[in-house]
Amino acid sequence: DSHVTIMQASASTLSENIEIARFAEHVGVDLIMPSYPLGFYPQHPDEVIGYTSELASATSLGMIVFAMNLWNFTRLHPSGFAPAWLEELVDTVPNIVAIKNEIGDPGVAGLADVFRRFTGRVMVSDPLEMNSPAWTQTFGMGWMGTSNYEYFGAKVPEYFALLQEPGGYDRAMEIYWQLHPARSASGMLMKESNAGTSFVHRLLWKYQGWLQGFNGGALRSPHLRLHDRQMQLLRRAALDSGLALAPGEDAEFFVGRVRA
């Protein structure tokens, strides 16, 4: 009961994503979070709002609106996902329950505006864990996701829980700084892989989880190639952060712990 399952609707068309969402509802998934297809090129904000609303209305699942600046919507609004669009969606679509808030890079003013507008109306999360101490202090952010926190073992949930407690901030920051070598390495590699691609390096994320005992193994294409220097940097940074690593040589990652 303490776990919430989220299905990311990232297929190639709206109709495919509606089909996936209905299947997810049938098998008991809790929430849906849409991506926007690579071929989706809206000419007006109403198309973004309409796509999101139609997918949300196709099931009774709660929806997390994935508001970020990498959907190629900046021609429609400089933030990449206008707060006014979110206002209309929250006001008119009753099963929108949360916002994954990544608009307006560079800087945090756009993020803060979304927190200011919507905290108390829906759940608002900045998924970048390095920002969580600021948002819990200023806006009471009580949920964070989704991202590659498994690289840090159980430490991110541990310090995030402390941030919610009166008097827990100092202890939370001790853990926060412990993780900084791993955080810095991960951030550097993600910036490197994202540059010019708008593509999250999911195989790298999967390797990060594998270091903590997750399965590893292949991903379906398309995805970016994972290089030795990247694996070596992530392994070393995790050890520098005092994280215990699961056994296994890097070659074993590509096979996976459980073979089909």
Residues covered by each model-derived region:
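Catalytic alpha/beta core domains of metabolic enzymes, predominantly
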Residues: 54-194
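Short glycine-/small-residue-rich flexible loop motifs, especially phosphate/cofactor-binding loops
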Residues: 21, 53, 132-133, 206, ...
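A short, hydrophobic/aromatic-rich structural module that often spans a beta strand
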Residues: 27, 109-125, 227-244
